Curated annotation (Swiss-Prot):
Major site of localization recorded for this protein: cytoplasm
Enzyme active site: 310 (tele-amp-histidine intermediate)
GO function term, MF aspect, one: RNA-3'-phosphate cyclase activity
Keyword set includes ATP-binding: yes
Protein name: RNA 3'-terminal phosphate cyclase
EC number assigned by the record: 6.5.1.4
Record family assignment: Belongs to the RNA 3'-terminal cyclase family. Type 1 subfamily.
Residues involved in ATP binding: 109, 286-290
Amino acid sequence: MHVLDGSSGGGQLVRTALTCAAVSGESFRMRYVRRARSNPGLQAQHCAAVNAVADICDAATDGVEVGSEAFSFEPEVAAEEADDDEEPTLGGTTSVEVGTAGSIPLVFDSLLPLAGALDEPITATLTGGTDAKWAPPMDYFQHVKLPLLREHGIDATVSVDRRGFYPRGGGEATLTVEPSTPTPITLTERGDREALTAYSVAESSLADDEVAEQQATAAAPDAAHEIAYTDADSAGSAVVLAAEYEHSRAGFAALGERGVSADAVGENAADALAAFESGPGAVDSHLADQLVPVVAVAGGEVRAPEVTTHIETCVDLLAEFDYDIDIEHTDDGAVVLSA
């Protein structure tokens, strides 16, 4: 069993460990989970990720509860303990409540890298936050990350049944991942921008003030606009700029907050897009972080705007499972990740 140190990382480290264990069949125990965070230990969305992946690979777990700073994960043990004649399989159906506004897209992130190792499809239905703080909104997941992964052989789709905004959540979405043959993810050049779409969503009570329209216009007045109003348990809003380039994709998001105007929310997304396009990355920094475990199992080369703590800690953890990723710093400040 691998003994992993979770003190220097956050939820991304937990999700990466789950990916490695499910694909390799190797067990781990993680100690000092998120110790450097202001709220150390597992939080609700991390527990949801552990439980979802455990369902998919018949894992036995211990210590999976909110606040726990140590937990273990043993793939295929639950199937073996069932004492039947069926071989353990990777895939199946899971339904997990993330809790309040815990991020549904971040839990989905723990399942996507499994695509190339699946014996049968994954169908994962989660309830919680679709558009939550400190996480990519659902439109980023749906219109930036998934299209990029599909271009590289990962057959995954998501349906959103209900939006969930901070703080109450209450959203619901279902991810389907088919057994796939991923191709190496080679994203070293950005090229010219070929398309830009502003996806702007707000809870129905904000329609009279045209919050979604204002966000989209402030973010990108000349882009295509996809405007949506939706019933939800909490009032909230989000805007995502989905940019398509000659050789890559990137996304830039901002969430509505009490006391922040819709125009300011849109401008935050616009500023992030402008900063990215003035820099050297082929993908945005959030996508680069999330692609690390996918590159580890599928191979490839990704040019990120910068090396983040998420990248460094995940690369170190991947090495524990014999997945080697090289980090090359370039003269223009970018970093190239290759496997």
